[in-house]
């Protein structure tokens, strides 16, 4: 065999191997990091009273009665794939503060949520529904998963405060309902920064939550959440908060998100998608 023929065969073989490798490892990824929110935050959709402040924070609901504020990442997220059955792995971290006139009358909390891409708030979402659920749908499937930081006890659906804490404040995992499927007691540190890490394993369907007031308190919980059976294939992610008769300010100071959806042997030339935002 001549050297030219050998080189040609080797080149074809290498090309085939690379194409096969790309086919096997094709994946969709989304990644962004916001270290400081700016007045014209183009990668966010604002709903209700939510807005960015000149101080670099994202203000959700106002510190007034019956306020709702939500902020969504502008690009839809491919959370599972109908062709391969694959479910994405994701990790999101954020820092928040809740500030109230006093530590007794605090309401109602905030949530990180995953919902259909056309999700919008309604006026009946205020108060204990955290801007995500309402009295008509809280027992029905609305294709929504949320992690709530709940500051106000609502007897209709919240865990009995006698069983978890004197105030009823808790962190919860919500699946299609404001009634959490898993909770852990939580104590508010008024106007102090809390760090949150939420992770999802697409292979095990385990959603894990870690909330920490540095050097003060640390909370964890986890639960199996079959995302493929709960939310649409394409979703939006974001934050929501609300107030009722009592109120407090709910602010997000930073936010990062990373997801990866492995598409297996799907030959998708546009399979690798990424986005990145960094505000100094």
Swiss-Prot record:
Family: Belongs to the leguminous lectin family.
Record-linked CDD domains: lectin_legume_LecRK_Arcelin_ConA
Cell division as UniProt keyword: no
PROSITE patterns: LECTIN_LEGUME_ALPHA, LECTIN_LEGUME_BETA
Binding site for Mn(2+): 148, 150, 158, 170
Keyword Lyase: no
Note: Lec2 is probably non functional, since a frameshift mutation leads to premature translation termination after only 98 AA. The sequence below ignores this frameshift mutation. Binds one manganese (or another transition metal) ion and one calcium ion. The metal ions are essential for the saccharide-binding and cell-agglutinating activities.
Example GO molecular function: metal ion binding
Signal peptide: 1-26
GO biological process: response to symbiotic fungus
Any single Pfam family the record assigns to this protein: Lectin_legB
Cited InterPro entries: ConA-like_dom_sf (IPR013320), L-lectin (IPR016363), Lectin_LegA_CS (IPR000985), Lectin_legB_Mn/Ca_BS (IPR019825), Legume_lectin_dom (IPR001220), Leguminous_Lectin (IPR050258)
Name assigned to this protein: Truncated lectin 2
Cited PANTHER family: CONCANAVALIN A-LIKE LECTIN FAMILY PROTEIN (PTHR32401), LECTIN (PTHR32401:SF45)
Organism of provenance: Medicago truncatula (Barrel medic)
Keyword list, A-Z: Calcium, Glycoprotein, Lectin, Manganese, Metal-binding, Signal
Listed SUPFAM superfamilies: Concanavalin A-like lectins/glucanases
């Amino acid at each position: 065999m001549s050297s030219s023929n050998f080189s040609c065969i080797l080149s074809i073989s290498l090309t085939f191997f690379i194409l096969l490798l790309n086919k096997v490892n094709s994946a969709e990824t989304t990644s962004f990091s916001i270290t400081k929110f700016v007045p014209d935050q183009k990668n966010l959709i604002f709903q209700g009273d939510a807005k960015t402040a000149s101080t670099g924070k994202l203000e959700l609901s106002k510190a007034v009665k019956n306020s709702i504020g939500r902020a969504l990442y502008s690009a839809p997220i491919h959370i599972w794939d109908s062709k391969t059955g694959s479910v994405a792995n994701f990790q999101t971290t954020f820092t928040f503060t809740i500030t109230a006139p006093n530590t007794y009358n605090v309401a109602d909390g905030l949530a990180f949520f995953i919902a259909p891409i056309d999700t919008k708030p309604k006026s009946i979402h205020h108060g204990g529904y955290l801007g995500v659920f309402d009295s008509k749908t809280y027992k029905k499937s609305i294709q929504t998963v949320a992690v709530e930081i709940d500051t106000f006890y609502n007897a209709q659906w919240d865990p009995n405060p006698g069983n978890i804490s004197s105030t009823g404040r808790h962190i919860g995992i919500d699946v299609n309902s404001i009634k959490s499927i898993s909770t852990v007691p939580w104590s508010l540190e008024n106007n102090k920064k809390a760090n949150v890490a939420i992770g999802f394993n697409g292979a095990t369907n385990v959603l894990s939550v870690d909330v920490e007031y540095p050097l003060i308190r640390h909370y964890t919980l986890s639960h199996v959440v079959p995302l493929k059976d709960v939310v649409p294939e394409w979703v939006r992610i974001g934050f929501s908060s609300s107030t009722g008769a009592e109120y407090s300010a709910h602010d997000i100071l930073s936010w990062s998100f990373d997801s990866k959806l492995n598409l297996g042997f799907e030959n998708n030339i546009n399979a690798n998608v990424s986005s990145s935002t960094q505000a100094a």
